Amino acid sequence: MARVTVQDAVEKVGNRFDLVLIAARRARQMQTGGKDALVPEENDKPTVIALREIEEGLITKEVLDARERQEQQEQEAAELAAVSSIAHNR
């Protein structure tokens, strides 16, 4: 297992405060959202995996925002389809 240094990850993000926010969002996605890791897990915790993904350039704030927007649009489309189906059956 390769060690992740905060400095390497900070260089990808810009500052350590944004790094904490991005890593926490990504770790939460893996922990509670059922999202798969983009790097081999190697028995690491979600926070370490998130830092490794950031360090490798696989996860950025823009990537997280785009994924969340897409998921929200898909959820809204499913809800609209369900409402339309209910209204159509009446």
Curated annotation (Swiss-Prot):
Keywords: DNA-directed RNA polymerase, Nucleotidyltransferase, Transcription, Transferase
Class of this enzyme: transferase
InterPro entries: DNA-dir_RNA_pol_omega, Pol_omega/Rpo6/RPB6, RPB6/omega-like_sf
GO biological process, one term: DNA-templated transcription
SUPFAM superfamilies in the record: RPB6/omega subunit-like
Catalytic reactions on record: RNA(n) + a ribonucleoside 5'-triphosphate = RNA(n+1) + diphosphate
EC number per UniProt: 2.7.7.6
Any coiled-coil regions, as ranges: none
Chain spans, region Disordered: 69-90
Listed GO CC annotations: DNA-directed RNA polymerase complex
Gene Ontology molecular function: DNA binding; DNA-directed RNA polymerase activity
Pfam families noted in UniProt: RNA_pol_Rpb6
SUBUNIT field: The RNAP catalytic core consists of 2 alpha, 1 beta, 1 beta' and 1 omega subunit. When a sigma factor is associated with the core the holoenzyme is formed, which can initiate transcription.
The family this protein is said to belong to: Belongs to the RNA polymerase subunit omega family.
Function: Promotes RNA polymerase assembly. Latches the N- and C-terminal regions of the beta' subunit thereby facilitating its interaction with the beta and alpha subunits.
Protein name stated in the entry: DNA-directed RNA polymerase subunit omega
Species of origin: Vibrio parahaemolyticus serotype O3:K6 (strain RIMD 2210633)
Gene: rpoZ
